[in-house]
Amino acid sequence: MQKRIIECVPNFSEGRNMETIKQITDVIDASKGVKLLDVDPGEATNRTVVTFVGEPEAVCDAAVKAIKRATELIDMRQHKGAHPRMGACDVCPLIPVSGITLEECAELARALAKRIAEETNVPTYCYEAAAFKPERRNLAVCRAGEYEALPEKMMDETRKPDFGARPYDEGVAKTGATAVGARDFLVAVNYNLNTTSTRRANAIAFDVREKGRPMREGNPIVGKIMKDENGNTIMKPGTLKACKAIGWFIEEYGIAQVSMNMTNLSITPLHVAFDEVCRAAEARGVRVTGAEIVGLVPKSCLVDAGRHFLRKQNRSTGLPERELVRIAIESMGLSNLKPFNPEEKVVEYILEAEEQKGVKKLVDMTCTGFAEETASESPAPGGGSISAYMGALAAALGTMVANLSSHKAGWDDRWEFFSDWADNGMAVMNELLYLVDEDTAAFNKIMDVFGMPKGTDEEKAARAEAMEAATLYATQVPLRTMKAAYRAFDVVRAMAEEGNPNSVSDAGVGALAARSAVMGACLNVKINAAGLKDRAVADALVKEAEEIQAAAQKAEAEILAVVESKI
């Protein structure tokens, strides 16, 4: 399952006192469920940009704590710096990374702004996607007049904060105000060119960037720049929306680059920009030799690119995520100048590495290790995890047949049909792999309840309530396994009927594995449901499980009949 991950980039109005900065970032570093990625202080601006990621609730909690600490340490009455600012924490944008939309981030930002005002007494404005008023989408409108204008703005009906508005007082004088917003993930990428010409690089940049280039009279290079009736330069737009770009020469590398900031990946994905820069460069006799990603990228950015470059080859995209990332790296030459390590550049991988420190996941074991762990005297992993893994193998077999079929000689016109089925199978496989560990985690939740105190009536009641909740979850997880494993029949059936006949036996084994996964998980639903006090809920769960089991047995028989007819 895709986790909901957001990024938070608060800008604190202190860039010179490293001890103060550390005290603020220590609060974030100590917050559970978030990963501090970067701390970038600026002396001239007297401002520090901090970046951290995590699940939404954890990120918002850490943001409130960090802003509270900043208001204790920073006195805006003493602040001077080159950058516009209006508070100890000047801005605090939330950015969707995975499993969450910009609209959902905007709702989170509004709730965060309200919390900050209530819990830290700092007035807050909502900007960009979180803005309540259209004009406040522009941060400059919220920050107009900066800190010095707050005495006038605090009670002005048109300029007062969205939350925490009150007469200007000593508290506001010390903390200032904070703008909380939501925006898309920004990706900075430099395209490497086989030229040293900044002029050529700039020409390519102007061809593609949304702003484009000034229109000229006569000669397009040196002709007089055209103006409208108001005296504004008339621009010829470039080909890529939501992209800003310039050309420059990098002495360290000895080449020119097109340097691009991508402000909305949903409008212009990375692979679309890469292809367009290649096209524009070729039109000017220049080649793109690779690309350099500056900073971090969301995983989807590379996965989508990997799929794109496979589709251009008429190749199946139903491959493991890491392979899609590798294909993206190779296709765009991301290691052209220096090695591109996804573990250090992909936001989700960085967060996963942090979360998995000291955690032993079943799906990361070798086949032998998993079997030996199952055979040990520990009660977990048990039948639930094994059922989920059998289901994952069923989906994997169907996916394998789809991938083999998509590349079969003479079947070139059907590659997309099989690619779609491979994608379907990979999605089912990934969900079942998640459930391998989740089933064991659900069992461990029950074990944790046994450790709860039961000395008083209140403790006994809390323990009983926790046991019912844990038992319910331990019943719901294998039911999810049943549903996912049953979906594996779709790809297995399609491949038995339409796939490469040389692999029809593999589809048959997939059907056997899917049936076993469903039946095994059904046993786990029944044994766990027996422990539920709420018998109406228990009976409903068992009834649903038995219906899925009956359908699975029927599907297996039908698929095996097809397989036997082709062997």
Write out the residue ranges for each language-model feature:
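A structural signal for well-ordered alpha-helices, especially hydrophobic packing surfaces
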Residues: 401, 429-436, 443, 475-482, ...
